[in-house]
């Protein structure tokens, strides 16, 4: 018993963040500042550095792998009536931001006659491929000039140089492109002191994130944290000690004991969890009494978050719009502790 308590103290007595604040930037789909506090001293740097590296290197995204330009044999060519040479065109193509839900590779085509500017918005996409920066300029055509390009798009992670994108059986005229798959463009973080009670030297971690729009900043952090969690599991070489439940008389309840579970224990995205927190929804009993219409009136709460919550509740045999007699009980905190092993 004593050894079990000592083992559990290794993680149970460390302070954990009770605040995770997401502040959207000018474009919420691309920019956000995320603050986590309080953290044990030193954990701000540990977590900030680990999450930053994962965000920039390990999230899945889509990018152009190669391009074929009609009439062009290699990237050191020039095209009649096109102001940019092929090398500059390839550099511009590398900056095309793409969102693709399915597996690749897939093809995209652009065909245009001059005079005028060829932009990423001129690309004819297929299926679930979306160009996220349609205003990006690819090249400029003079009067009478014409260009046709076919792009190969694939999914991956991190950065892949052009040399690795050249297949062994590449046809003449196929030009490989450097692929930046990561949907996260920039990540910076800083660690400051913060206060918790009378202790003044806990850590406050502030992360500033910019994405290409294929993923929201808060979701990118959630995915990075999940990757880190998954990688660390192999280092845990013991089974977590089970709590010894004292024999006690459990009172009868007028409602499902699952309603006493806190919503922050559900596996929800950061955005959904923050919306519930901001609406003072603490327990599942608070949540299930809400209608879909009431939830959608919550600030920053959209259809995606609604579907996520409905799916989680369905897995528990619950749904929105339920009537819960006797809710909330007067001694809800005490009941939640007594029933935590019963839901």
Curated annotation (Swiss-Prot):
Statement: the UniProt record of this protein carries the keyword NAD: no
Record-level GO cellular component terms: cytoplasm; DNA-directed RNA polymerase complex
Protein's GO biological process: DNA-templated transcription
Transcription regulation listed as a keyword: no
Annotated NCBIfam families: PRK05182.1-2, PRK05182.2-5, rpoA
Membership in a protein family: Belongs to the RNA polymerase alpha chain family.
Role, per record: DNA-dependent RNA polymerase catalyzes the transcription of DNA into RNA using the four ribonucleoside triphosphates as substrates.
Domain remarks: The N-terminal domain is essential for RNAP assembly and basal transcription, whereas the C-terminal domain is involved in interaction with transcriptional regulators and with upstream promoter elements.
SUBUNIT field: Homodimer. The RNAP catalytic core consists of 2 alpha, 1 beta, 1 beta' and 1 omega subunit. When a sigma factor is associated with the core the holoenzyme is formed, which can initiate transcription.
Name used for this protein in its record: DNA-directed RNA polymerase subunit alpha
The gene coding this protein: rpoA
């Amino acid at each position: 018993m004593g050894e079990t308590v000592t083992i559990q103290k290794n993680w149970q007595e460390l302070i954990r963040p009770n605040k995770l604040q997401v502040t959207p930037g000018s474009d919420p789909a691309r920019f956000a500042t995320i603050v986590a506090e309080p953290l044990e001293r030193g954990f701000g740097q540990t977590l900030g550095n680990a999450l930053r590296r994962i965000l920039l290197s390990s999230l899945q995204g889509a990018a152009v792998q190669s391009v074929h330009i009609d009439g062009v044999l290699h990237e050191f060519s020039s095209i009649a009536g096109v102001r940019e040479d092929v090398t500059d065109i390839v550099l511009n193509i590398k900056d095309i931001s793409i969102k693709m839900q399915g597996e690749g590779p897939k093809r995209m085509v652009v065909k245009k006659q001059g005079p005028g500017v060829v932009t990423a918005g001129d690309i004819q996409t297929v299926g679930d491929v979306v160009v996220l920066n349609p205003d990006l300029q690819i090249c400029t055509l003079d009067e009478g000039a014409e260009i046709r390009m076919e792009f190969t798009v694939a999914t991956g992670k991190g950065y892949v140089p052009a040399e690795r994108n050249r297949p062994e059986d590449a046809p003449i005229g196929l030009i490989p492109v450097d692929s930046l798959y990561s949907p996260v463009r920039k990540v910076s973080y800083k660690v400051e002191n913060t206060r918790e009670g009378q202790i003044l030297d806990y850590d406050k971690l502030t992360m500033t994130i910019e994405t290409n729009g294929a993923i929201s900043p808060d979701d990118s952090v959630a995915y990075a944290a999940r990757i880190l969690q998954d990688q660390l599991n192999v280092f845990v070489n013991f089974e977590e000690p089970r709590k010894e439940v004292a024999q006690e008389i459990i009172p009868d309840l007028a409602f499902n004991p699952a309603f006493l579970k806190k919503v922050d224990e559900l596996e929800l995205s950061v955005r959904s969890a923050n919306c519930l927190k901001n609406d003072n929804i603490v327990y599942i009993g608070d949540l299930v009494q809400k209608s879909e219409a009431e939830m959608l009136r919550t600030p920053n709460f959209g259809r995606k978050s609604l579907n996520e919550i409905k799916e989680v509740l369905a897995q528990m045999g619950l749904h929105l719009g339920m009537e819960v007699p006797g809710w909330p009980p007067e001694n809800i905190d005490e009941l939640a502790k007594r029933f935590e092993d019963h839901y």
